[in-house]
Amino acid sequence: TLMRSSAASDVYKRQIYIESFVLREIMKKIYLSEVDSTNLYAKSNIENLADKSIVHAANQTAGRGRLQRTWVNLGEGNLFLTFVLKPSNSFNEVYSNLTQYLSVVLCKILEEYGLKPQIKWPNDVLINGKKIAGILSETVMQGSLFKGLVLGIGVNLNTSEKDLASIIDKEATSLNLEISKSVDVNLFLDKLAEEFFADYDNFLQKGFELIKNDYISRTCFLDTEICVQVFNDKKCGIAKAINDKGELVMSNNQKEFVLTIGDIL
């Protein structure tokens, strides 16, 4: 009797554990019908969000890109997502490569659709030379205290050509236009999150080295003459290489220089 009771108790405890585990996993995914920006929401609520949480919105009204650019709102049916990351170390140089890691993850998923995406350094993802996604990483501090990182991504999944025409400054595309059918946002989100976290912990240990070959093999504009906007400055020259830190190595008049940030024009 005691043995049967003990066994029953173990089964009960295991069931409670499974239920609490499932609940914990569900709680890690925050869904919002509309938000100004998933990154802003994540930053404002980071104290209450667990490590590896996901903030997903059906619609985003005030998204931002790198260098404080506005991310044009293309409405529902597209992916607006932020990963909430709270690694134990307050500083790790690999954090600056997280956007590049995510760009490689996204490329691999798009390749499953039969596409050939390219990465425009540092982290824009292009299809046939047209932008399909934007990525932005931000460090969250409270005074001098490190609170975590928010890594946001916007992917055009179901956008009409008319809506894309509203993006005046750059050519853009959407997955549905490239594959000629609509895309299930939730399935795409789940795949992206699964692939992102599959190697995330390994990436924190190894850094850019882990993705270097995958990144460089998909990088466009190498060995061509380009200009890069770096805040209010413009640097022009030949894009020579991507170094071991994920930085862009350029040369001008046989003088090499390295860029850690910028926007290829």
Identify the meaning behind each predicted range:
Residues 14-115, 131-133, 140, 182-183:
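N-terminal lobe of the biotin/lipoate ligase/transferase fold
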Residues 23-24, 88-91, 97-117, 127-265:
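Long, positively charged amphipathic alpha-helical accessory segments at protein N-termini or as interdomain linkers
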Residues 5, 76, 253:
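ATP/adenylate-binding site constellation spanning eukaryotic-like Ser/Thr protein kinases
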Residues 5-9, 37, 174:
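Short linear Ser/Thr-Pro motifs
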Residues 1-15:
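Single conserved hydrophobic/aromatic residue that forms the stacking wall/gate
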